[in-house]
């Protein structure tokens, strides 16, 4: 089997694939001013057929898991179509995402139906005010409700990511609930 290897001989059974750099949050540690499109920049994001072709090639090189990232991957209008193509037409065995959880409560059913294998949600504080100050969005309750909804739908491969920011959310109390 021809495997994807680096110069040290390490194989890559798993890759992160950024499908957009657009994000709807304005986290100070990432995009403090939010996503600022440059009108003179005519770049385009990978199209669905390009993602499919790339994933097929990666699968043939031994990659069995793809993590979709961004920006915020769910802002793509074809996000769920991308997941379905990766799951059903590429040879990739596991598809997971890293998301900020925006509208997670509204997307929970589609997440389960899409066949997604796992979700990592960035929640930098369980304190509503601190969360809002970091992300510029008052969406913590919506995100937590989305997690509960996913669990009720028996979707249990849910992980939480947090960026610790000294003096902002570095207290253990920011993560108790």
Provide a role label for each language-model segment.
Residues 48-67, 75-176:
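Radical SAM/AdoMet-radical enzyme domain recognition
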Residues 72:
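Conserved G/P- and acidic residue-centered "switch" motifs that form tight phosphate/ATP-binding loops
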Residues 7-49, 61:
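Canonical Radical SAM [4Fe-4S] cluster-binding loop centered on the CxxxCxxC motif
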Residues 1-5:
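Radical SAM enzyme core and accessory elements
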């Amino acid at each position: 089997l021809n495997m994807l290897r680096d110069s040290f001989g390490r194989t890559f059974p798993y890759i992160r694939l950024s499908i957009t750099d657009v994000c709807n949050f304005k986290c100070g540690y990432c995009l403090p001013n939010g996503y600022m499109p440059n009108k003179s920049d005519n770049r385009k994001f990978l199209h669905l057929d390009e993602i499919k072709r790339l994933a097929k090639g990666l699968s043939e090189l031994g990659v069995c898991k793809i993590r979709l990232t961004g920006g915020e991957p769910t802002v793509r209008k074809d996000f769920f179509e991308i997941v379905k193509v990766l799951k059903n037409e590429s040879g990739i065995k596991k598809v997971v995402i890293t998301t900020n959880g925006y509208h997670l409560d509204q997307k929970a059913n589609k997440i389960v139906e899409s066949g997604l294998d796992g979700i990592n949600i960035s929640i930098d504080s369980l304190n509503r005010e601190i969360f809002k100050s970091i992300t510029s969005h008052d969406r913590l309750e919506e995100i937590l409700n989305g997690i509960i909804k996913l669990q009720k739908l028996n979707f249990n491969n849910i992980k939480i990511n947090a960026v610790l920011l000294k003096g902002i959310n570095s207290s253990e109390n920011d993560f108790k609930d």
